[in-house]
Protein backbone atom coordinates (compact mmCIF):
# COMPACT_ATOMS: atom_id res chain seq x y z
CA UNK A 1 0.00 0.00 0.00
CA UNK A 2 2.73 2.38 0.93
CA UNK A 3 4.55 1.75 -2.35
CA UNK A 4 1.42 2.38 -4.41
CA UNK A 5 0.66 5.57 -2.51
CA UNK A 6 4.26 6.78 -2.74
CA UNK A 7 4.49 6.20 -6.49
CA UNK A 8 1.15 7.90 -7.05
CA UNK A 9 2.24 10.85 -4.89
CA UNK A 10 5.48 11.18 -6.88
CA UNK A 11 3.39 11.38 -10.05
CA UNK A 12 1.06 13.98 -8.57
CA UNK A 13 -1.77 11.47 -8.28
CA UNK A 14 -3.79 10.05 -5.43
CA UNK A 15 -4.11 6.27 -5.14
CA UNK A 16 -6.96 4.63 -3.32
CA UNK A 17 -7.21 0.98 -2.40
CA UNK A 18 -10.70 1.48 -0.97
CA UNK A 19 -13.21 -1.13 -2.13
CA UNK A 20 -15.33 1.42 -4.02
CA UNK A 21 -13.65 4.82 -4.40
CA UNK A 22 -16.07 6.03 -7.11
CA UNK A 23 -19.71 4.94 -7.34
CA UNK A 24 -19.82 4.75 -11.15
CA UNK A 25 -16.63 2.72 -11.61
CA UNK A 26 -15.40 -0.74 -10.74
CA UNK A 27 -13.77 -0.95 -7.33
CA UNK A 28 -10.78 -2.66 -5.77
CA UNK A 29 -11.19 -6.27 -4.78
CA UNK A 30 -8.82 -8.58 -3.00
CA UNK A 31 -10.17 -11.89 -4.25
CA UNK A 32 -9.33 -15.15 -2.51
CA UNK A 33 -7.99 -17.99 -4.66
CA UNK A 34 -7.80 -21.44 -3.11
CA UNK A 35 -7.03 -25.01 -3.93
CA UNK A 36 -7.08 -28.10 -1.73
CA UNK A 37 -4.14 -30.52 -1.70
CA UNK A 38 -3.39 -33.94 -0.24
CA UNK A 39 -1.23 -34.11 2.88
CA UNK A 40 1.94 -34.63 0.85
CA UNK A 41 1.18 -31.56 -1.28
CA UNK A 42 1.37 -33.60 -4.47
CA UNK A 43 -2.25 -33.87 -5.62
CA UNK A 44 -4.69 -31.02 -6.19
CA UNK A 45 -7.90 -32.42 -4.70
CA UNK A 46 -10.08 -29.99 -6.66
CA UNK A 47 -9.15 -31.61 -9.97
CA UNK A 48 -10.95 -34.47 -11.72
CA UNK A 49 -9.98 -35.08 -15.36
CA UNK A 50 -13.24 -36.98 -16.00
CA UNK A 51 -15.57 -34.13 -15.02
CA UNK A 52 -16.70 -31.68 -17.76
CA UNK A 53 -15.60 -28.76 -15.55
CA UNK A 54 -12.49 -30.68 -14.42
CA UNK A 55 -13.73 -30.45 -10.81
CA UNK A 56 -13.80 -33.21 -8.22
CA UNK A 57 -16.83 -33.98 -6.03
CA UNK A 58 -14.85 -32.40 -3.16
CA UNK A 59 -14.55 -29.18 -5.18
CA UNK A 60 -18.30 -29.06 -5.81
CA UNK A 61 -19.17 -29.73 -2.16
CA UNK A 62 -16.65 -27.19 -0.83
CA UNK A 63 -17.83 -24.55 -3.31
CA UNK A 64 -21.47 -25.26 -2.44
CA UNK A 65 -20.72 -24.68 1.23
CA UNK A 66 -19.13 -21.33 0.43
CA UNK A 67 -22.15 -20.31 -1.67
CA UNK A 68 -24.64 -21.50 0.97
CA UNK A 69 -22.92 -19.47 3.67
CA UNK A 70 -22.07 -16.48 1.48
CA UNK A 71 -24.54 -14.04 3.11
CA UNK A 72 -22.89 -14.59 6.51
CA UNK A 73 -19.41 -14.95 5.06
CA UNK A 74 -19.67 -11.45 3.57
CA UNK A 75 -19.42 -10.03 7.10
CA UNK A 76 -15.87 -11.42 7.18
CA UNK A 77 -14.77 -10.93 3.56
CA UNK A 78 -16.41 -7.55 2.84
CA UNK A 79 -16.75 -6.03 6.31
CA UNK A 80 -17.38 -2.36 5.57
CA UNK A 81 -20.16 -0.25 4.10
CA UNK A 82 -17.79 0.65 1.28
CA UNK A 83 -17.19 -3.07 0.70
CA UNK A 84 -20.89 -3.67 0.13
CA UNK A 85 -21.05 -0.72 -2.27
CA UNK A 86 -18.55 -2.61 -4.46
CA UNK A 87 -20.80 -5.67 -4.79
CA UNK A 88 -22.86 -4.37 -7.71
CA UNK A 89 -23.92 -6.10 -10.93
CA UNK A 90 -21.75 -5.65 -14.03
CA UNK A 91 -18.62 -4.54 -12.12
CA UNK A 92 -16.79 -7.92 -11.84
CA UNK A 93 -17.50 -7.96 -8.13
CA UNK A 94 -19.84 -10.91 -7.53
CA UNK A 95 -23.22 -9.36 -6.89
CA UNK A 96 -24.95 -12.77 -7.06
CA UNK A 97 -24.58 -16.16 -5.37
CA UNK A 98 -23.55 -18.02 -8.49
CA UNK A 99 -20.54 -19.94 -9.72
CA UNK A 100 -19.09 -20.58 -13.12
CA UNK A 101 -15.97 -21.32 -15.14
CA UNK A 102 -14.07 -18.09 -15.70
CA UNK A 103 -17.25 -16.15 -14.92
CA UNK A 104 -15.98 -12.88 -13.49
CA UNK A 105 -19.47 -11.86 -12.36
CA UNK A 106 -20.05 -15.01 -10.29
CA UNK A 107 -19.28 -15.09 -6.58
CA UNK A 108 -17.16 -18.19 -7.05
CA UNK A 109 -15.16 -18.47 -10.25
CA UNK A 110 -13.53 -21.67 -11.44
CA UNK A 111 -10.21 -20.25 -12.56
CA UNK A 112 -8.95 -22.16 -15.56
CA UNK A 113 -5.79 -24.03 -14.93
CA UNK A 114 -2.70 -23.38 -16.99
CA UNK A 115 -3.02 -25.20 -20.30
CA UNK A 116 -1.52 -28.64 -20.00
CA UNK A 117 -1.09 -28.21 -16.23
CA UNK A 118 -4.71 -28.23 -15.12
CA UNK A 119 -4.13 -30.98 -12.56
CA UNK A 120 -1.83 -28.76 -10.55
CA UNK A 121 -3.12 -25.29 -11.35
CA UNK A 122 -6.94 -25.37 -11.28
CA UNK A 123 -8.29 -23.30 -8.39
CA UNK A 124 -11.41 -21.57 -7.15
CA UNK A 125 -11.76 -17.84 -6.54
CA UNK A 126 -14.07 -16.01 -4.15
CA UNK A 127 -14.67 -12.62 -5.72
CA UNK A 128 -16.70 -11.20 -2.82
CA UNK A 129 -13.66 -10.12 -0.85
CA UNK A 130 -11.61 -6.96 -0.50
CA UNK A 131 -8.60 -5.58 1.32
CA UNK A 132 -10.59 -4.11 4.20
CA UNK A 133 -11.07 -7.59 5.66
CA UNK A 134 -8.99 -9.35 8.26
CA UNK A 135 -7.42 -12.14 6.18
CA UNK A 136 -7.34 -14.56 9.12
CA UNK A 137 -11.07 -14.18 9.73
CA UNK A 138 -11.89 -14.21 6.00
CA UNK A 139 -9.92 -17.40 5.35
CA UNK A 140 -11.20 -19.04 8.52
CA UNK A 141 -14.78 -18.31 7.48
CA UNK A 142 -14.16 -19.55 3.95
CA UNK A 143 -12.67 -22.82 5.21
CA UNK A 144 -15.48 -23.36 7.73
CA UNK A 145 -18.15 -22.70 5.08
CA UNK A 146 -16.45 -25.01 2.60
CA UNK A 147 -16.01 -27.80 5.12
CA UNK A 148 -19.70 -27.54 6.01
CA UNK A 149 -20.50 -28.07 2.35
CA UNK A 150 -18.27 -31.15 2.33
CA UNK A 151 -19.80 -32.53 5.54
CA UNK A 152 -23.34 -32.01 4.22
CA UNK A 153 -22.49 -33.16 0.67
CA UNK A 154 -24.00 -29.95 -0.71
CA UNK A 155 -24.15 -29.30 -4.46
CA UNK A 156 -23.72 -25.78 -5.88
CA UNK A 157 -26.31 -26.13 -8.64
CA UNK A 158 -25.56 -25.67 -12.30
CA UNK A 159 -22.72 -23.49 -13.48
CA UNK A 160 -23.64 -19.99 -14.58
CA UNK A 161 -21.96 -19.35 -17.91
CA UNK A 162 -23.14 -15.76 -18.38
CA UNK A 163 -23.34 -12.62 -16.27
CA UNK A 164 -26.11 -13.36 -13.71
CA UNK A 165 -27.09 -9.70 -13.94
CA UNK A 166 -28.23 -10.32 -17.52
CA UNK A 167 -30.75 -12.95 -16.38
CA UNK A 168 -34.31 -12.00 -15.52
CA UNK A 169 -35.46 -12.20 -11.91
CA UNK A 170 -37.43 -15.33 -12.83
CA UNK A 171 -34.39 -16.98 -14.44
CA UNK A 172 -32.24 -16.20 -11.41
CA UNK A 173 -34.91 -17.59 -9.08
CA UNK A 174 -35.21 -20.77 -11.17
CA UNK A 175 -31.42 -21.28 -10.92
CA UNK A 176 -31.32 -20.47 -7.19
CA UNK A 177 -29.21 -17.36 -7.78
CA UNK A 178 -29.72 -14.68 -5.15
CA UNK A 179 -28.51 -11.11 -4.78
Q: Can you say where each PLM-predicted feature lies in the sequence?
A:
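Catalytic-core signal marking the mid-to-C-terminal active-site face
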Residues: 3-9, 13-16, 39-179
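Histidine-centered divalent-metal-coordination microenvironment in nucleic-acid enzymes
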Residues: 18-42
Amino acid sequence: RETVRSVADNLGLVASLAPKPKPDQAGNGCHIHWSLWDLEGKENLLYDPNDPMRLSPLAYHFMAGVLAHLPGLLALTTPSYNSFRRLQPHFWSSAYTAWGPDNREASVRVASGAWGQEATSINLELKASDSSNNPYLALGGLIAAGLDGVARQRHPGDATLIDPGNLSDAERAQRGIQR
